Amino acid sequence: MELFAVPGLPEIRDGDDLAAMIDERVDLREGDVVVVASTVVSKAEGRTFDLSDFPASERAEAVADRLAEIAGEEKDPRFAQAVIEESTELIMEAPFLLTATRFGHIGVNAGIDQSNVPDGDLLLLPERPSESAARIREGIAADRVVVSDTCGRPFRHGQRGVAIGWAGLPASRDWRGERDRDGREMGVTVQNVIDELASAANLVAGEGDGGTPVVVVRDWEFGDHDGSDNHFREVEGDFVRQALRQWTFDD
């Protein structure tokens, strides 16, 4: 398996044909997986906004005041309003905002970015990342696309790449019913391949001002396995989410 960044991409702006810009810069093959950072997808789709686009509601004022009290520094209620509008649920309101997006992703601040946004204050996640992945797939020679983001993980320090949208491949590879090396039947293992591809690509893409937003994964095969598009855990079976709903931050 080989991973390499797509070179020479300029700053992406609203309305840019991202698929064409990728396709003209690299000789893609049909079986390649193209991992595209959500930041450039959002920029091309016009998801850049100013804080003034989000007048603060009473709830946003209260949320920002609480966060400011905990952090010991002022928090902009307009940012809290943007998070509220981009979320279906605020799972935690302190000591930070843990949210569920409309498309099922759970993360901090609804994934809203304030870094590397030259045309505004805020960069929101794509509205429907899998549809974004499908549109990119239609415009490139490769037949598999993953839209990635970075986020933290419970029980571990640091961030890693995750998939928030995909097209042309299943989200997971199902090993259940197959045999291990000792001949025992596997009954549990479902491998989330799109998250693993996103995480591997993030090692190549990097972060900050030296980051490259599009990475090609070559010579990776899904194999002869059953696949599934189950990616975001259903609320009913998400016991951590249910527990966090009942948890209260004690400062």
Curated annotation (Swiss-Prot):
Cofactor note: Binds 2 divalent metal cations per subunit. The ions could be magnesium and/or manganese. Monovalent cation. The ion could be potassium.
InterPro entries: F420-0_g-glutamyl_ligase, F420-0_gamma-glut_ligase-dom, F420_ligase_CofE_arc
Binding of a divalent metal cation 2, residues: 150, 207
EC number, UniProt record: 6.3.2.31, 6.3.2.34
Cofactors that this protein relies on: Mg(2+); Mn(2+); K(+)
Gene3D superfamilies: CofE-like (3.30.1330.100), CofE-like domain (3.90.1660.10)
One example GO MF annotation: GTP binding
Positions bound to GTP: 9-12, 38-39, 43, 116, 205-212
SUPFAM superfamilies per UniProt: CofE-like
Binding site for a divalent metal cation 1: 113, 149
Enzyme class: ligase
Protein keywords: GTP-binding, Ligase, Magnesium, Manganese, Metal-binding, Nucleotide-binding, Potassium
Reaction catalysed by this enzyme: oxidized coenzyme F420-0 + GTP + L-glutamate = oxidized coenzyme F420-1 + GDP + phosphate + H(+); oxidized coenzyme F420-1 + GTP + L-glutamate = oxidized coenzyme F420-2 + GDP + phosphate + H(+)
This protein's pathway: Cofactor biosynthesis; coenzyme F420 biosynthesis
GO annotation (BP), single: F420-0 metabolic process
HAMAP family referenced in this protein's UniProt entry, alphabetically: F420_ligase_CofE (MF_01258)
Function according to Swiss-Prot or TrEMBL: Catalyzes the GTP-dependent successive addition of two or more gamma-linked L-glutamates to the L-lactyl phosphodiester of 7,8-didemethyl-8-hydroxy-5-deazariboflavin (F420-0) to form coenzyme F420-0-glutamyl-glutamate (F420-2) or polyglutamated F420 derivatives.
Subunit structure: Homodimer.
UniProt record similarity statement: Belongs to the CofE family.
Name of the protein described by the UniProt record: Coenzyme F420:L-glutamate ligase
